[in-house]
């Protein structure tokens, strides 16, 4: 079976030599750009076409950079231990890809997010490219592949977690095993409760080590 052009694109993008030469040079330019930058064509054409991208009117691509790391929480003025200030160690309950889609949707309020994909990352940012569609463009409204976006039920779909990244964050996408499903969250919470019981600071753990509970 002859390999397609898109398979060659995917293998080239995954090669370490490509990342060390081409991607590293592009990251220097991308870091100095705005948070949301509209681009003429997708950087990873194979991923864009897999998500439904077409080079036609009403469809644009935007590159979004999202800062890596935890949340930038405000430091409280009232006194407390540094451990209890709630500043460090907090991460958002959404993936960075989901956040990138929301940033692009706010930049282009008249468009709907079709999908997004990972591009690259450096020490400070992760870069994603988001595909946006104008649901009221005549070309889009006459295309059966995209005219479902004009339905009012799909308005603001990215802010309701209806994109692929949003559904993955909500635990609704299927995967091998429990991970990636709503049942994985239940199993994870159950495991966390058991670990909390066995912690040395837990009253349950301290009393469990006695043959007889004190005071009884």
Curated annotation (Swiss-Prot):
Q: Where are the transmembrane segments?
A: none
Any idea which GO molecular function terms this record carries?
RNA binding; structural constituent of ribosome
Family of this protein: Belongs to the eukaryotic ribosomal protein eL15 family.
Q: What is this protein called?
A: Large ribosomal subunit protein eL15
Q: Name one GO biological process term.
A: cytoplasmic translation
Species this chain originates from = Metallosphaera sedula (strain ATCC 51363 / DSM 5348 / JCM 9185 / NBRC 15509 / TH2)
Please provide the record's keywords in A-Z order.
Answer: Ribonucleoprotein, Ribosomal protein
Its organism's taxonomic lineage begins at:
Archaea, Thermoproteota, Thermoprotei, Sulfolobales, Sulfolobaceae
UniProt key word Ribonucleoprotein: yes
Instruction: Identify the stretch annotated as signal peptide in this record.
Output: none
Pfam families listed in its UniProt record: Ribosomal_L15e (PF00827)
Q: Offer a single GO CC term for the protein.
A: cytosolic large ribosomal subunit
Organism domain of life: Archaea
Do you know which InterPro entries this protein is assigned to? Rbsml_eL15_core_dom_sf (IPR024794), Ribosomal_eL15 (IPR000439), Ribosomal_eL15_arc (IPR020926), Ribosomal_uL23/eL15/eS24_sf (IPR012678)
* Xref: HAMAP family: Ribosomal_eL15 (MF_00256)
Could you tell me which PANTHER family the record lists for this protein?
Answer: LARGE RIBOSOMAL SUBUNIT PROTEIN EL15 (PTHR11847:SF4), RIBOSOMAL PROTEIN L15 (PTHR11847)
């Amino acid at each position: 079976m002859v390999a397609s052009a898109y398979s060659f694109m995917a293998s080239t993008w995954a090669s370490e030599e490509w990342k060390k030469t081409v991607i590293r040079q592009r990251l220097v330019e991308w870091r100095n750009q705005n948070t949301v930058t509209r681009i003429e064509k997708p950087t990873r054409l194979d991923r864009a076409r897999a998500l439904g991208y077409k080079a036609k009117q009403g469809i644009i691509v935007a590159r979004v950079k999202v800062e890596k790391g935890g949340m930038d929480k405000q430091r409280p003025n009232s006194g407390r231990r540094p451990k209890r200030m709630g500043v460090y160690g907090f991460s958002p309950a959404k993936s960075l890809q989901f956040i990138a889609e929301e940033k692009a949707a706010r930049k282009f309020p008249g468009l709907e997010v079709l999908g997004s994909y990972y591009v690259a990352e450096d020490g400070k940012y992760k870069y994603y490219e988001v595909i946006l569609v104008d649901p009221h463009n005549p070309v889009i409204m006459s295309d059966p592949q995209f005219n479902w976006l004009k339905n009012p039920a799909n308005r603001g779909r990215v802010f309701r977690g209806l994109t692929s990244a949003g559904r993955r964050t909500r635990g609704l996408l299927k995967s091998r095993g429990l991970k990636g499903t709503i049942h994985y969250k239940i199993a994870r919470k159950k495991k966390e409760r058991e670990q909390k019981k066995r912690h040395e600071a837990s009253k349950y753990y301290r009393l469990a080590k006695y043959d007889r509970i004190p005071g009884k």
